[in-house]
Each structure stands twice: as structure tokens, then as C-alpha cells.
């Protein structure tokens, strides 16, 4: 599969100067010449754009596009929409990919004949040596299916890769849903069959004060409302 498959990395960024360099280094070393990193910047005001431009001067596999200025979900959707690869890997601006992540995930696509893979990760603080959870799956749980994931979502975008055939189902991502990764996971299970959860950590998932996304909690009434709205949007696809 790797000889013919093209990998696209879809990354949404916003004011990511602190960790972006390390993340891009960890990604690019794993990619082949025909692969690409599509970065959608949502109006960064720090040195994020300068960092990306420096990388682009040395590496033509990086493409920078202007984000829609409509928040993280639509910024991610914008990056996905501009990808050209056979397999799309989602990437946050502040994590670090472990060596062999791309190779291992592509192996799973080949072995399982699936359309979406979610792998485990190690949750850290701002410093990667600060281990918060040695296994996100052990902390959160894991497994495919609507019943298992509607209340407590186990799909985690930064650990997700999917086949390009899912894109017409995924896009556009509704503005009023809460989680883009849950949206993608459910649509795969609905239209392409069960997602594969790989209990191998292939990423350092960094949690810090500047995180764009978080583990945030809502009140039960808000959660119920969000889930009902989410299901309505799902059934429309």
C-alpha cells in the first residue's frame, strides 16, 4: 500500500508558535516525497506564519492556506477540503508524532481493510516528560459504534486517519455540533463500517494552558442538548 498510497496531513493552526516547529519536524520525517502537509491558518497573530514559511522554503510538501476565521471545526474542515491524498491524517499544532506512526497506521489500513483508524496516545503536560496519562484509551475508553460513543466520545482527532472516500460524507461540518472528531467517526461507522481502534500509543498528546481544544465538561442538560442536535445532523447525512 505505501508504495502507491499518498498521505495528506491536515493541520489546523492558530497562534501555535510555541510547539509548531517540534510537531512539524516529527511529521515531515515520516512522509514520502509525494505526501503533503496542508496547513490552514485561522489568522495567527504570533510567529506561526513565519515558522511555516521557513519550513516551506525548505520543504515543498507543505501547503499553507488561509483559514475561514470561523473557529477550530471549520479550520479543520478547510484543511481537509484542500487535501489530495489517499489517506488523511489529522494533526494538532502542539502534539508530537512518535516515530513510525504513519507506517503503522497504513499497515492497519491494509490489514483490516478499514476506512478509519484511531490509535492510542500518551497524554502529557507542556513538557513531554510530564506524563498525565500513559494511555488515553485506558483513561477514556475506546471502541467504535454510536451507542459506545454518543455520551462519552472516544474518537480523538489528533490520533485519527481516514480514507479520502469519507470526505464527501464529512464535509461540510455543521457549525452547531460540538466535536468534529466524533462527527467523522460516526459518519465512518454509518457509511463505511466499524472504525479500528489501535491500542498502541503513536503520539504525545500535549495538554497545556494555550490548548485550543481541551477535555472540557458541560452540565448534563447541555450535554443532552448537544447529543440530540448531533444525532439530528448525523441522520441528515
Tell me what each language-model feature is.
Residues 16-29:
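Short, well-formed alpha-helical segments that are part of the catalytic scaffolds
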Residues 27, 42-43, 70:
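Conserved short acidic donor-positioning loop in nucleotide-sugar-dependent glycosyltransferases
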Residues 102-131:
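Conserved donor NDP-sugar-binding/catalytic core segment of glycosyltransferases
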Residues 143-216:
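Conserved nucleotide-sugar donor-binding catalytic segment
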Residues 6-8, 36, 183:
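Cell-envelope/extracellular polymer assembly enzymes that use nucleotide-activated donors
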Residues 67-83:
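Glycine-rich, basic loop-to-helix element that forms the pyrophosphate-binding segment
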Residues 88:
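Short aromatic/hydrophobic "clamp" motif used to bind/position activated sugar donors
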Residues 41-50:
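A conserved acidic beta->alpha catalytic loop
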Amino acid at each position: 500500500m505505501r508504495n502507491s498510497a499518498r498521505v495528506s496531513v491536515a493541520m489546523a493552526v492558530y497562534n501555535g508558535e510555541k510547539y509548531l516547529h517540534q510537531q512539524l519536524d516529527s511529521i515531515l520525517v515520516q512522509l514520502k516525497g509525494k505526501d503533503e502537509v496542508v496547513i490552514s491558518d485561522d489568522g495567527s497573530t504570533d510567529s506561526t506564519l513565519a515558522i511555516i514559511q521557513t519550513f516551506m522554503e525548505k520543504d515543498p510538501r507543505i501547503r499553507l492556506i488561509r483559514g475561514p476565521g470561523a473557529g477550530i471545526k471549520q479550520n479543520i474542515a478547510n484543511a481537509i477540503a484542500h487535501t489530495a491524498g489517499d489517506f488523511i491524517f489529522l494533526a494538532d499544532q502542539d502534539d508530537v508524532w512518535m516515530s513510525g506512526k504513519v507506517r503503522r497506521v497504513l499497515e492497519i489500513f491494509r490489514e483490516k481493510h478499514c476506512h478509519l483508524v484511531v490509535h492510542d496516545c500518551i497524554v502529557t503536560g507542556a513538557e513531554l516528560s510530564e506524563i498525565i496519562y500513559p494511555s488515553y484509551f485506558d483513561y477514556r475508553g475506546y471502541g467504535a459504534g454510536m451507542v459506545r460513543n454518543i455520551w462519552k466520545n472516544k474518537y480523538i482527532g489528533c490520533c485519527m486517519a481516514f480514507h479520502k472516500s469519507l470526505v464527501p460524507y464529512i464535509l461540510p461540518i455543521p457549525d452547531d455540533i460540538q466535536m468534529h472528531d466524533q462527527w467523522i467517526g460516526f459518519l465512518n461507522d454509518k457509511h463505511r463500517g466499524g472504525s479500528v481502534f489501535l491500542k498502541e500509543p503513536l503520539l504525545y498528546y500535549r495538554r497545556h494552558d494555550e490548548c485550543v481544544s481541551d477535555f472540557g465538561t458541560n452540565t448534563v442538560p447541555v450535554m443532552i442538548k448537544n447529543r440530540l442536535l448531533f444525532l439530528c445532523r448525523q441522520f441528515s447525512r
